[in-house]
Amino acid sequence: MRKLVAAALIGVMTMGLTVCGASAADFDSSEDITVVSREDGSGTRGAFIELFGIQEEQDGEKVDMTTDEANITNSTSVMMTTVADDEYAIGYISLGSLDDSVKAVKIDGAEATVDDINDGTYKIFRPFNIAIKGDVSDAAQDFINYIMSKDGQAVVEENKYIAVGEPEDYTSNGAEGKVIVAGSSSVSPVMQKLKEAYEKVNDKVEIEIQTSDSTTGMQNTIDGICDIGMASRELKDSETEAGLTATVIANDGIAVVVNNDNPIDELTSDQIKSVFTGETTTWADLEK
């Protein structure tokens, strides 16, 4: 049975799982691997299972083959806390969100870095999209113009993401008002940085960011609940058929992360697939 990891329980789990003085020397490779995945609807999960082949074609439909034993987390931050608190855990997050609370493993010999993505050696990355439905307000359009400008793409690069396009100088259209941006918890951190930078050059527009997941963000945009949706994946056919238009605002790597006390520093793509489909269940199995 899948286990939902609720943010409210993290503090309790931390007290129960933390071992004083734990280190790589104390790591018991015979222990079961704690597989940690994102929830259904997460764009990061969708990109992850596609990039590692953790899906199968069944009756014309793509089926997610993530093990039923996976712990399910509902955001990037909960994923990171869960892996940081469990010595035997493995998960995956946006590269732009990576910090020293967890350790990113090399994949097929390549490091999860912007440089390795740019030179083609690290192949686990996906687009960050924003989406709109039809015409948007002048305020929403002005914010989009800023995101895609030289200034906006500089913010993208400063925060460990990969800039896109051939940006031009930003010129405000003089808009005023409020813009609601909703969706992916992976896109949300860079969107927050873009909001902060934008409001310094146009304080007449208020940007509100609502963090959930990619699918919810797209549905909210379709329903007119928000002005701009955020997705950490390509849009689905059903979403574009509902009237959404996507724009890539950045590219982002997906880092496979383990606890800092885990001595493993590198895995192959096949090993990661084996772990997340439940074929490999202990850390010792990865050493064979």
Feature locations, PLM:
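Exported/periplasmic ABC-transporter solute-binding proteins
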Residues: 4, 21-288
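Sec-dependent N-terminal signal peptides of Gram-positive bacterial secreted proteins and lipoproteins
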Residues: 1-24
